[in-house]
Amino acid sequence: MAQPFSPKQRDAIRERLKDRARKYAVSTGVKKTSLDMLTADAGISKSSFYKFFSSKELLFLEIANDWEMQVIAAVNESLKTSVGTDDKRRAANMVYTAFTTIHALGICNFLCDDLPKLARFIPEEEARSHYLSSAQGIFDMLHHAEIHFTQPDEVVLAAIQILYLSIIHINRIGPNFFPALRLLVVGACEELVA
């Protein structure tokens, strides 16, 4: 009979699984990533996988949550550096920081394509509170920072979604993408923030 994993082994295996899932999320995508791929890379059997996660989808949701925390941390850091600036500048810094962090993590396609499909594997309440679309998450962070808008929330959210989806075209636009994105974010915040 196989020996159970020690707590230290469990932690190490769990981290290896998450690391492999991160790799596949940004390269292959969730749908094309098999349980065999994840377990082989982590050095465990398929049956052992279920001692760590009840499904492949829940593993990917956990790394989505980790990435969400990284984006939130980056935005919170940008808030610290924008103390004393007006709300339009603060909002622009927050939105731009969220976009650049998402790009730096390489997770735009994962968030746009895979995360909405994964959200169906969790209860609706939990999906709303944690696994938000990135645009909704950015919008919620602006509200949390007490940024007030001149337009209805639906219009603000749509503007954030349009800006967010532009990240997908970064390679087509080339090296001027981020300076142009910054201009668009600042312009949108000038119009939308009270």
Sequence positions of predicted segments:
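N-terminal intrinsically disordered/low-complexity leader segments
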Residues: 1-12
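Alpha-helical structural segments
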Residues: 16-23, 27, 41, 58-78, ...
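Ser/Thr-centered, proline-biased regulatory motifs
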Residues: 30-40
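Short hydrophobic/aromatic patch on the recognition helix
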Residues: 43-53
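Hydrophobic alpha-helical connector segments
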Residues: 62, 76-104
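Amphipathic alpha-helical packing segments from all-alpha helical-bundle domains
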Residues: 72, 76, 119-157, 179
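Short linear capping/connector segments at secondary-structure termini
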Residues: 111-120
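Hydrophobic/aromatic-rich alpha-helical bundle segments in the mid-to-C-terminal region
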Residues: 143-188
